[in-house]
Amino acid sequence: MAGGFVSQTPGVRNYNYKLTPKVFVTCFIGAFGGLIFGYDLGISGGVTSMEPFLEEFFPYVYKKMKSAHENEYCRFDSQLLTLFTSSLYVAALVSSLFASTITRVFGRKWSMFLGGFTFFIGSAFNGFAQNIAMLLIGRILLGFGVGFANQSVPVYLSEMAPPNLRGAFNNGFQVAIIFGIVVATIINYFTAQMKGNIGWRISLGLACVPAVMIMIGALILPDTPNSLIERGYTEEAKEMLQSIRGTNEVDEEFQDLIDASEESKQVKHPWKNIMLPRYRPQLIMTCFIPFFQQLTGINVITFYAPVLFQTLGFGSKASLLSAMVTGIIELLCTFVSVFTVDRFGRRILFLQGGIQMLVSQIAIGAMIGVKFGVAGTGNIGKSDANLIVALICIYVAGFAWSWGPLGWLVPSEISPLEIRSAAQAINVSVNMFFTFLVAQLFLTMLCHMKFGLFFFFAFFVVIMTIFIYLMLPETKNVPIEEMNRVWKAHWFWGKFIPDEAVNMGAAEMQQKSV
């Protein structure tokens, strides 16, 4: 039987709830949206290391890879090859802006469905690709799907979960992403051993499976109480809230949702309003957290792990196996965040993960520098290569329980309803833009910066860790509608939040500012 709880957080309202099967099931299915993103992250790097794929579409890179005299740092340097990976994220950036309107007007679940549908079409284009144009069209369609899913799923999970467990439930999105990566690397490992072009076609075409999963999931999922109220279905919203909280005593939380909705209706232009001073904390965080998440360098590992491991001297099969190991490590360590984020809070995980990533990145850069040198003509022995893989796993673990899940959780939970869709669109857009830059420029940066590239990312890890320490207040256990109290108490952000904002709605605040 589900136990009864009362959210207990000093200075904010307390809500009644029980851990019901319905909230577990809905959040579990909702998290499927992360699978399409994760599968693509894991599949693209493996496919770009497969010789039949390179020979078919990127013969110049294939010849460089086979050259015995090629600088190890520059073996895979090709703007066209990186465009295959990065084009998805430009499309995701654009679609996330449209997705914010669909998420608000039609509900979170239909935005998720549309994401799965466009991802499905994109997987068909890639699986049957006959030329570069078909590959890129497919990647763009995949990107539209990722943009819709990434915009709607974190918001859906945050709104369905009880405040005290919002972190754990929201981190299901990151778990799904990493699970998708692991499944993709396993598939790549086996398809890479197939003769001819069938292997990479299977890898790319199987992206249709997670797409179908999120489409079916979206059709059977209920919409969130917040979204139902926002669209005028008040009675249905209360019934849904009672259902997912497992109690009829939801009047206080329901009234807060009603108040938040009424306030949001007075805000005609959320994109304009998010620029107002009282929303400065949310604007800065939704810009800087996804920016810093990408500057951890994690997608260097996620996109190009097989390519990177081949650069380190591993064979094709061993490179894919090593990428699979790092993916499994990341999946297991993501569960650490699921079970600790609502107990220890967001800040401690951000800070600890940052320190762990910093130390491992410096060690990786130093070892590669010593072994390859600046010319990139040295050799790395098996024991040293295995040590580098171990250091990469330590780095991935630090990311997996900090910046990985929290980079999606925190931006989705800090914004009031009246700017939530715009804030999440900004979050996804910034994330996708810098994901695109990292994906497009990494192989060129590796060629020119060599082992110094790891020190480059380590520098940003220092900056982001300091930023979190100084600028992010603790948000665990705080209801979304009560978040202004947290910002008001902060040493810096408090000056942007008027005293009345803690107890007064957005509509009244807007009238006072006119």
From Swiss-Prot:
Pfam families: Sugar_tr. It is a multi-pass membrane protein. GO terms for molecular function: monosaccharide transmembrane transporter activity; sucrose:proton symporter activity. Induction: Induced locally by wounding, elicitors such as chitin, bacterial pathogens such as P.syringae, compatible fungal pathogens such as A.brassicicola, E.cichoracearum and F.oxysporum, and incompatible fungal pathogens such as B.graminis. Also induced by aphid feeding. It comes from the Eukaryota. Coiled coil: none annotated. Its main location: membrane. GO terms for biological process: sucrose transport. Keywords: Cell membrane, Membrane, Sugar transport, Symport, Transmembrane, Transmembrane helix, Transport. The chain crosses the membrane at residues 23-43, 80-100, 117-137, 140-160, 172-192, 202-222, 283-303, 321-341, 348-368, 387-407, 426-446, 451-471. The keyword Electron transport does not apply. Residues 1-22, 472-514 are cytoplasmic. SUPFAM superfamilies: MFS general substrate transporter. The keyword Transport applies. Mediates an active uptake of hexoses, probably by sugar/hydrogen symport. Can transport glucose, methylglucose, galactose, xylose and mannose, but not fructose. Belongs to the major facilitator superfamily. Sugar transporter (TC 2.A.1.1) family. This is Sugar transport protein 4.
